[in-house]
Amino acid sequence: MNQTTETDSMRINLQRTYKDAINALNSLQSNFASIEATKKLGPSVNRNELSINEVHEFTKRLGYTPTDFNKLNIIHITGTKGKGSTCAFTESILKQYTISKIGLYTSPHLKSVRERIRINGQPINQEKFAKYFFEVWDKFTTTKSDPQECPTLQPCDQVKPMYFKYLTILSFHVFLQEGVDTAIYEVGVGGTYDSTNIIDKPTVTGISALGIDHTFMLGNNIASITENKTGIFKKGVPAFVSRQLEYPETHELIEKRAKQLGVSSLEFVDTEDLPNVKLGLSGEFQKQNAALAIRIANSHLKTIGITQDLPEFNNNDGKIKKLSNKFIKGLENVDWPGRCQIINNNPTGITWYIDGAHTIESINASSTWFKQEQIKLEKPKRRALLFNQQGRENYAELLEKLFNVTYGTGSEPQIKFDDVIFTTNTTWSSGQFNSELISKNTSEDAVKKLEVQNNLSEVWRKLDGGVSKRHVFADIETAVNYLKDLGDKDLQVFVCGSLHLVGGFLVVLDNERD
């Protein structure tokens, strides 16, 4: 199993500072070699079942049972595209009501790992993160698992959960200790075997748009992915699912799984125009996520006994008849950096369009959003693309999708780039990462040789016939400085691809060095 043991060289002199917590957490990351080995094995029910059982065991060693988590009144959301935005919309709506503490657990983070564990919209502070992190760390060091029941967790005092699993367990501990009374959980990968799926009785479950991703864990077809995602359905709990416009064939399987798992109700949610609402997240596709969040929040509020100031729905088709002012305010005030985010960077005059996207479906949505924003502009502008997809085997296919959407076909408007830049996710020109942006799951050799970036540059040359100026940089800081040095007051820059790129870009833009 993917666990980590503390060898003598890895033993960390734990001084109980936030920086020490980050260093300890980073020691739990899977390295590139172990991830590649897992990919070659393909999906494994036995391995996945073992993984989720280990989460149960680790929480047991902390002194918790699955029913303890029911106190959190958990909303559980999965999907391939839009699950994070749906969580953000849901949180923003609920903040308008008299809920004392709302927890939000999401992944990945952009700039700081504390973004993953929020209370009332704010990441927990460094002091609390370190405090709770080491409470969990010490408990795992001083407790034991039955070697017959948990042979993979031996020796108990050395084995810790890997990075994401540890953070998930930590989030449960934080929320319970902090007295959170509503918690929103975004699934990491899939559903059935995800670390978050130890939840016994959520108040409601939701699934956003489905697509092909994480195939080495979930299978390489939409049916197996749907089977896994629907694993968050729970007996007696309502389920809301975005209507799957790209994969309508999944509806029958979703209905079958809902029946198998005994949900109290299942509703497919259509995208709706909300004429009196200006969503806080731009992009036409966010209407779908907002519509799903409206149903999830409405259901949750009723479950916890809040029945005033809720939306009204039509009896015949279930569509929204009237939104309450609180729902409107929540939808308009949502804040979710790095997703369809626009930053006007004075005094340089550069406008940055930022969106993390790593699947064909999300690249399509992201590129469409950027294109629509550019079409609105009155006169032609100079444009640049900043792109990376490290660790994605289909990076060329993703770049080709971006090109096809922005450049268009036939009579479609064409949005072309004057400069195209490919960079690694390395933060600084010194070759260093900010400590909270370190990722061990890519090949160091490939990063040093700029293999992916040079390949992407060649792919683009073939796509546009060598018209754009192409640049390959070893780090994000150098790429950003190049764009700033262009001196074009109307430069429009599309920052797209890996969320690791987006997070590093935001750190560089704000010059937030460790």
From Swiss-Prot:
Its main location: mitochondrion. GO terms for molecular function: ATP binding; metal ion binding; tetrahydrofolylpolyglutamate synthase activity. It is found in: Mitochondrion inner membrane; Mitochondrion matrix; Cytoplasm. The gene is MET7. Mg(2+) 1 binds at S107, E186. Catalyzes conversion of folates to polyglutamate derivatives allowing concentration of folate compounds in the cell and the intracellular retention of these cofactors, which are important substrates for most of the folate-dependent enzymes that are involved in one-carbon transfer reactions involved in purine, pyrimidine and amino acid synthesis. GO terms for biological process: one-carbon metabolic process. A monovalent cation. Its cofactor is a monovalent cation. This is Folylpolyglutamate synthase. Mg(2+) 2 binds at H214. The keyword Cytoplasm applies. Its EC number is 6.3.2.17. GO terms for cellular component: cytosol; mitochondrial inner membrane; mitochondrial matrix. Pathway: Cofactor biosynthesis; tetrahydrofolylpolyglutamate biosynthesis. It comes from Candida albicans (Yeast). It is an enzyme of class 6 (ligase). Keywords: ATP-binding, Cytoplasm, Ligase, Magnesium, Membrane, Metal-binding, Mitochondrion, Mitochondrion inner membrane, Nucleotide-binding, One-carbon metabolism. It catalyses: (6S)-5,6,7,8-tetrahydrofolyl-(gamma-L-Glu)(n) + L-glutamate + ATP = (6S)-5,6,7,8-tetrahydrofolyl-(gamma-L-Glu)(n+1) + ADP + phosphate + H(+). It comes from the Eukaryota. InterPro entries: Folylpolyglutamate_synth (IPR001645), Folylpolyglutamate_synth_CS (IPR018109), Folylpolyglutamate_synth_euk (IPR023600), Mur-like_cat_sf (IPR036565), Mur_ligase_C_dom_sf (IPR036615). The keyword Repeat does not apply.
